[in-house]
Regions:
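Periplasmic-binding protein-like
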Residues: 49-50, 127-134, 212-249, 268-280
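Short helix-initiation/N-cap motifs at beta->coil->alpha
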Residues: 84-95, 139, 178-191, 228
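A ligand-binding cleft/hinge motif common to bilobed small-molecule-binding domains
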Residues: 92, 109-117, 163-166, 193-194, ...
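Extended ligand-binding regions for polar small-molecule ligands
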Residues: 68-78, 138, 145, 150, ...
Length: 280
């Protein structure tokens, strides 16, 4: 399967106390073992931050969204695995995979070399181009060539933050201003609309969803040219090779039988599937 680096992503790789995770994972492993002994199936715990919509979110107290429903379809009628979702902070997604608390995660996760060294990437389930967002009355930013001296908000550890940090290394004479935050994407977009900073780089689907749902009509979206196809992937803990093979096969089947297309239309309002060759 071809791996493709995504331009930006919502997420931030943070730190969680190792002792707390170790204590939690010990208890959860015992619970999982009890569940497996009862059902005869292996329990797979899938972590998510339940954001951004429409990829992952809560509705009436229940998790849903494109990636959540794809996972449900992957494990539907499996005679080997039972799937369970657990909501956690973004930093907890990765820390939980590290501690074997979770076997899998879905959270609009992009491909990076650093993550590929620590985790297993399943086949991609969606494509999600990146865009530049500014206020409609701001004509000073028309492309990435114009962000020098302009300000944005980023979450520490995201691929967008790292990309802009690299931009600043290459443009020391006129760097872009990075304001680090722990706010979620909806809050960040609201502050952009209020004029608290100048621009935001993010995923097209997430941007268009927030603009529509929050009524941020004073923002405009600028397409970013890229010869790389930004994809979204399920991520698995190291050592879960057998699970990865199962997930990859099921994603291929769901692509061929039209399930992925149906879910894409339902949650994205259009076809945002990877190229078939990249799923194999």
């Amino acid at each position: 399967m071809k791996k493709i680096i995504k331009y930006s992503s919502l997420a931030a790789l943070g730190l969680v106390a190792a002792g707390v995770l170790a204590a939690c994972s010990g208890g959860e492993k015992k619970d999982a073992a009890t569940s497996e002994a009862t059902s005869g199936k292996k329990e797979i715990i899938v972590a998510t931050n339940a954001s951004p919509k429409p990829f992952n979110y809560e509705e009436n107290g229940e998790l849903t969204g494109y990636e959540i429903e794809v996972v449900r379809a992957i494990f539907k009628d499996s005679d080997k695995y039972d799937v369970k979702f657990e909501k956690t902070e973004w930093s907890g997604v990765f820390a939980g995979l590290d501690a074997d608390r979770y076997q899998m995660a879905v959270n609009n996760i992009s491909y990076t070399k650093e993550r590929a060294e620590k985790y297993l990437y399943a086949a991609p389930t969606a494509k999600n181009p990146n865009v530049l967002v500014v206020k409609k009355d701001d004509n000073s930013i028309k492309s990435l060539d114009d962000i020098g001296g302009k300000s944005t908000e980023v979450v520490q550890g995201t691929t967008s933050a790292k990309q802009l940090e690299e931009y600043n290394k290459q443009h020391t004479d006129n760097p872009t201003v990075l304001n680090y935050t722990k706010a979620d994407f909806q809050q960040i977009m609201g502050r952009l609309s209020d004029g608290q900073f100048d621009y935001k780089i993010f995923d097209k689907i997430g941007v268009e969803t927030v603009i529509k749902n929050q009524g941020l009509d004073n923002l405009k979206v600028i397409e970013l040219p890229s010869d790389q196809q930004p994809y979204v992937y399920p991520l698995l803990a190291k050592g879960q090779d057998e699970l990865k093979a199962f997930v990859d096969k099921r994603i291929q089947e769901l692509y061929k039988d039209g399930t992925l297309e149906k879910l894409s239309q339902q949650f994205f309002g259009g076809s945002y599937l990877p190229a078939e060759a990249d799923i194999k």
